[in-house]
From Swiss-Prot:
SUPFAM superfamilies: PLP-dependent transferases. This is Cysteine desulfurase IscS. Gene3D superfamilies: Aspartate Aminotransferase, domain 1, Type I PLP-dependent aspartate aminotransferase-like (Major domain). Its main location: cytoplasm. Pathway: Cofactor biosynthesis; iron-sulfur cluster biosynthesis. Signal peptide: none annotated. Transmembrane segments: none annotated. One of its GO terms (biological process) is [2Fe-2S] cluster assembly.
Length: 387
């Protein structure tokens, strides 16, 4: 069987063997409903508490009760935006939300939905480097602003947004602040206190945990109308039977993610840089966005004259997995929205390829990717009508 190389880790990651190992007993033996009063239920409580302890410490929250279990970051993002709509827009008349054009569809689409209900949403444009400034946020805030929602790191470019500065402005202005940290956790340090975040979303499968489980940090003292009703789980904040094995797995994945932060920076970052430098030697290849203020695993490259989908399928034939952008939208085969937002033509935006590494990638895999990518660029340009 040919070697398979996975370079789509911003879409999802392989589960860490240590995570699977710690989950197994709760799939096989300790399968009781935690809400049950008998021993099958109560014996799961220590493991849940330990997992929550790992989660709140992993983001430097003040209290274990500040982290609420959800099914994924999409749910977390929806909960924040719709909860703020109920709590601030309807009840207090604060009918304005500030976000950016670079957000994940889970935020953008929810904001579009809220607009249909009469909420005013300001979508801050990104600059030629793919970022925004804290000053843009400050200028956009009005007395009617209920929430600012800005991602910590972009899923396509890996660019890190000025979260601490934005959080400080929101605190000063008395505006709630939410950050989608899905692409930051496990790659760079994430500290909700330094960020002055009121809400923070995360998803286990982006840091080598299981799919179908995520979390939402809600700062102590901040209220948020529940998205789901029908039970008193998570202190009455999120109804639904607790998914014990996945909670346990997510806790362990968070612990391992924090432990591997130096490895991400020193090893994964150097592999990404090696890949990037080699690809830049191919004529008319460019890296999209700021190359300095990024998470260490991500590069978004444009190969002029080659449709991103064509390159993607060529790599796939050689058992190399990459992406043209967000996995939640990639089946649509639309132009890369970040490239469009920074002012690239739609023709150029269609040439984007995202390569995202993990701690499980090897230098041999990167060398093979460089070889295959370079050969594919030559072959596809020879048959391209636009190069």
């Amino acid at each position: 069987m040919l070697q398979r190389i996975y370079l789509d880790n911003n879409a999802t990651t392989r589960i860490d063997p240590k995570v699977k190992e710690i989950m197994d007993p709760f799939l096989r033996d300790h399968y009781g409903n935690p809400s049950s009063l008998h021993q099958f239920g109560t014996e799961t409580h220590p493991a849940i508490a330990e997992a929550l302890d790992k989660l709140y410490k992993g983001i430097n929250a003040r209290d274990i009760d500040d982290v609420i279990i959800t099914s994924c970051a999409t749910e977390s993002n929806n909960w924040v935006l719709k909860g703020v709509y109920f709590d601030e827009c309807l009840k207090k008349g604060k009918n304005h939300i500030v976000t950016t054009v670079a957000e994940h569809p889970a935020v953008r689409s929810t904001c579009n939905f809220l607009e249909s209900l009469g909420v005013e949403v300001t979508y801050l444009p990104i600059n030629e480097h793919g970022s925004i400034t804290a000053e843009q946020v400050k200028e956009a805030i009005t007395e009617k602003t209920a929430l600012v929602s800005v991602m910590w790191a972009n899923n396509e470019t890996g660019l890190i947004f000025p979260i601490e500065e934005i959080g400080a402005i929101c605190k000063e202005k008395g505006v709630l602040f939410h950050t989608d940290a899905v692409q930051a956790i496990g790659k760079i340090p994430v500290d909700v206190l330094k960020a002055n975040a009121d809400f923070l979303s995360f998803s286990a499968h982006k840091f080598h945990g299981p799919k179908g489980i995520g979390g939402l940090y809600i700062r102590s003292g901040v209220g948020l109308t529940p998205l789901f009703h029908g039970g008193e789980h998570m202190n009455g904040r999120r109804s639904g039977t607790l998914n014990v094995p996945y909670i346990v797995g997510m806790g362990e994945a968070m612990k391992l993610a924090v432990e591997h932060l130096d490895y991400e920076k020193e090893v994964v970052g150097k592999l990404r840089d090696k890949l990037e430098e080699a690809l830049l030697k191919i004529p008319d290849v460019m890296v999209v966005g700021d190359r300095i203020h990024r998470v260490p695993n991500t590069t978004l490259v444009s190969v002029r004259g080659i449709e991103g989908e064509a390159m993607l399928w060529d790599l796939n034939r050689s058992n190399i997995a990459a992406s043209t952008g967000s996995a939640c939208a990639s089946e649509d085969l639309e132009a890369n929205p970040v490239m469009v937002a920074i002012g690239a033509s739609k023709e150029l935006a269609h040439t984007a390829i995202r390569l995202s590494l993990s701690r499980f990638n090897t230098e041999a895999e990167i060398d093979k990717t460089i070889e295959v990518f370079s050969q594919a660029a030559i072959r596809l340009r020879n048959i391209s009508s636009s190069y």
